[in-house]
Amino acid sequence: MKRISKLATSLPFLALSIAILLSGCGTIHRVNSDYDTTIGKKWKTTNVHQDDELKGQLSRVAVLPMFKGEYDHMDLSLIEENIRLELAKLGLFEVISVDPEAMKELFAEERFSSIGVLPAQLIEKLHARYALDGLLFLDLSYFKAYQPVGIGIRAKLLNSDSGKLVWAADEIFDSSNPEVSNAARKFYKRESIIAFPLQNTKSVLHSPGRFSKYVGNSLFSAINLQKS
């Protein structure tokens, strides 16, 4: 009977403790959300070429494996995947990921640069396999894994029917640039603070993986499909 009595008296205290803990988590989340702010200009991707042919022409776009150039010795699969996922999340096209194994099977090479020599039947073979109407090349032009992290991407989108370049962007996202860090933190606050409520938005500037999500979003948000 004494054990039951002790348990009964401890239950209100336990309930109160849980309530305090839960309210504390809510407070931390609110503090991060309300007060973890950025001041100043936010970077926007502006080094962009877009042809009018892009609007309303492409619905199924294949993304080729990212050409890593001098960074080919690094495993950047997470960064590559994050950039592709950010394109898919924008809902601009149906995004088809072409894996390196498929490229090697078709062309004996896993990756091609958008500014290099391409196989003569690249578009034809990929169109036959994936029924695509657009082809996106990605080149990693700059990468810095340590603070301040940085990622440079050159992207080129071709109309697979005409072979014409319909969109291109070439940007270096350097987190030491205040405008870039502000934009990255704002993106992280909007997209990730619910999943990681205890983390300050500055953590996006310390992780190439998290930073790459911002890079993909900023880069592909520059695609304008609105008809004038």
Name each region found by the language model:
Residues 2-14:
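Bacterial N-terminal signal peptides that target proteins for export
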Residues 70-74, 142-149:
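Solvent-exposed loop/turn segments connecting transmembrane beta-strands
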Residues 12-23:
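Bacterial N-terminal signal peptides
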Residues 25-57, 129, 148-150, 160-228:
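C-terminal/domain-edge helix-coil "capping" segments
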Residues 42-49, 119-123, 137-140:
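N-terminal post-signal-peptidase region of extra-cytosolic proteins
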Residues 60-65, 135-139, 152-156, 168:
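Soluble periplasmic/extracytoplasmic beta-strand elements of cell-envelope proteins
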Residues 142-144, 157-161:
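Beta-strand elements of well-folded, non-transmembrane domains
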